[in-house]
Amino acid sequence: MKYLSTRGHAGQPANPEFCDILLGGLAPDGGLYLPETYPQVTRAELDAWRGLSYAELAFAILSKFITDIPAVDLKAICAKTYTAEVYRHVRAGGDARDITPVHWLEKDADGRGRLGLLELSNGPTLAFKDMAMQLLGNLFEYVLAKRGETINILGATSGDTGSAAEYAMRGKHGVRVFMLSPHGKMSAFQRAQMYSLQDDNIFNIAVTGMFDD
């Protein structure tokens, strides 16, 4: 799968693949990356996906967009990411193995759900951003190891984004995170989440000012 910049001139490498854009972030021309083509999903595939676990479904979808990571490795990354141990903060009566359990508010006479809430905040930081960030951390570690490279990530946060990023990257080989946060402007819970981390590759920097400064 090749990717294109929204501004039309991605630069080098021409038409990069997933691993290139994973480490590069924005395209050299300042645009965002989009797939060169969008995969088609058949009705049979959709029906088959209904019976998959969250990790299996993530692999099935991601494998259509990530073709430069061997399927066996990508499947292992998904299985490592989406586990009951990582997404363990479920409501009473919930099953952490579901990763994103549905809390049904209404059911019909046959007991089938009609109106439900999808829980996305069962990860390490209780933020929905854990859903993507945990996968991103494992992908970063995998690709950097394959290439023999390291990366420094400079981020700025006003709360949950920074926490989710740090908890996803903590302990990851080849990754160092430098996170700017507004001194005294975050909740006590958010400060405790971020500033209590003792990992050697996580650096919290509290600065005077706000996120938009």
Give each language-model segment a name.
Residues 1-213:
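PLP-dependent amino-acid enzyme catalytic core
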